[in-house]
């Protein structure tokens, strides 16, 4: 690894430890459990379930504005732009700690969570350009895997600490949040020290794309044009949509059912939905990173997607049998899948994107994540609420729908991987040339 890359890596490693003190508060599973428990009895149950569903899916659907972040950061220094987003997020998370336990407080808390997640989505989108510039393809997955390991372990421990504190006294929330915001400033400082390799060249390429009329736009039609031009990437996005939709449908539904059917409080809910999956990610990240460094992301997803299908199947069985042990098992398998998902989600688009369009490809990717995140909570919780009025085992059928959707995505990756093999074989075949014309 070049000296500049090693220097950047050290600062990113520092940030990966300290920024979770900020992120833990708006981690979708953690904040969903907090809201479900804290506002139970304050508002009507069905309304609370839908608010929890939206908050729990906020990490995904906040990405719907990513194309706007790509446009706003175009032709601008990326690191200072990211620092601005981090500071805005600190302010919003700090406000969450002062929300009253009332209907109005619930809505204000939800608004702060959504705005904070919008800021984090911008950070993730722009960070992909920095990773592409700073880390070469052969080491990129391993480097980002190590960063992800530090982040998720810190998040897992913070989630457990928050759950234990709030089971003891819910008012700890008002002390821990401002404290976490202060600690996270170290992560903001660390990011401010990162240097972008090829910064001048990248800005020149972005300026040239603006002059050629090929710059990112606020108009979502630009996303459609990109997908039309890159059909293989469009196929990848279609399969990701199905797999991701099935996954995103599960978390809001699980948060609701852990409380309503399994009677878990803060600690139990956070363990199943967040801490256990996060703690398992470092186990699988090194293995997934080695695979992703060797193969195209389509071939990677062809294997990896089935782990998500298995996890969804175990959760469905847990609901059918009302067995808590299966919930823990599903959380373990889900965490193993998340390890690979964290790598491929952040890096997969780089197997398709030219250097100066990395943020644009990432913008398309995360915007579509936002679209499915907007659909998923209403689809799963809405299906459960509708079935609960008619049948006894509504939770089983609702999770069965999640399982089937994940399965369709995994099958799609099998088809796409075979198509990619055919394309590679065709491009490797020597082109036929016409025989020379004899001169009479």
Where are these regions (language model features)?
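Multi-pass alpha-helical transporter architecture, strongest
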Residues: 2, 97-100, 183-196, 400-433
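Intracellular juxtamembrane helix-capping segments at the cytosolic ends
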Residues: 122-135, 340-354
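C-terminal ends and interior cores of transmembrane alpha-helices
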Residues: 87-104, 307-322
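Juxtamembrane intracellular "pre-TM" segments in multi-pass secondary transporters
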Residues: 1-9, 198-238, 430-440
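Helix-to-loop junctions at the C-terminal end of transmembrane segments
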Residues: 64-78, 166, 283-297, 384
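Helix-loop boundary and gating motifs at the non-cytosolic
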Residues: 1-64, 232-275
């Amino acid at each position: 690894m070049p000296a500049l890359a090693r220097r950047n890596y050290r600062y990113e490693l520092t940030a990966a430890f300290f920024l979770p003190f900020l992120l833990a508060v708006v981690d979708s599973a953690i904040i969903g459990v907090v809201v479900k428990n804290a506002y139970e009895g304050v508002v009507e149950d069905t309304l609370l379930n839908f608010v929890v569903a939206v908050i729990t899916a906020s990490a995904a659907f906040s990405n719907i504005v990513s194309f706007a972040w790509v446009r706003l950061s175009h032709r601008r220094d990326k690191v200072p732009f990211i620092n601005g987003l981090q500071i805005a997020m600190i302010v919003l998370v700090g406000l969450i700690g002062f929300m009253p336990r009332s209907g109005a407080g619930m809505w204000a808390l939800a608004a702060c969570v959504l705005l904070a997640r919008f800021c984090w989505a911008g950070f993730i989108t722009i960070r992909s350009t920095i990773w592409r510039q700073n880390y070469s393809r052969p080491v990129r997955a391993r480097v980002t895997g190590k960063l992800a390991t530090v982040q998720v372990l810190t998040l897992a421990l913070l989630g457990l600490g928050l759950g234990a504190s709030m089971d003891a006294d819910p008012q700890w929330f008002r002390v821990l949040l401002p404290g976490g915001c202060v600690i996270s400033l170290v992560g903001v400082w660390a990011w401010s020290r990162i240097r972008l390799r090829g910064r001048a060249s990248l800005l020149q390429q972005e300026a040239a794309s603006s002059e050629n009329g090929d710059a990112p736009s606020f108009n979502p039609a630009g996303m459609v044009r990109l997908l039309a031009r890159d059909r293989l990437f469009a196929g990848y996005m279609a399969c990701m949509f199905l797999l991701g939709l099935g996954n995103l449908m599960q978390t809001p539904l699980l948060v609701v059912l852990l409380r309503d059917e399994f009677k878990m409080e803060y600690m139990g809910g956070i363990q199943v939905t967040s801490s256990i999956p996060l703690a398992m990610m470092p186990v699988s990240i090194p293995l997934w990173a080695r695979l992703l460094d060797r193969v195209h992301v389509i071939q990677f997803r062809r294997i990896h997607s089935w782990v998500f299908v298995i996890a969804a199947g175990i959760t469905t069985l847990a609901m059918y049998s009302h067995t808590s042990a299966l919930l823990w098992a599903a959380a373990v398998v889900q965490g193993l899948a998340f390890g690979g998902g964290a790598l491929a989600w952040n890096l997969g688009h780089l197997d398709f994107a030219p250097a100066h369009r990395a943020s644009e490809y990432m913008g398309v990717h995360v915007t579509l994540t936002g679209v499915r995140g907007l659909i998923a909570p209403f689809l799963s919780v809405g299906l459960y609420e509708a079935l609960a009025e008619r049948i006894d085992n509504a939770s089983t059928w609702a999770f069965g729908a999640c399982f089937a959707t994940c399965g369709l995505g995994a099958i799609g990756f099998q088809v796409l991987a075979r198509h990619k093999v055919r394309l590679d074989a065709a491009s490797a075949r020597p082109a036929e040339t016409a025989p020379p014309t004899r001169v009479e």
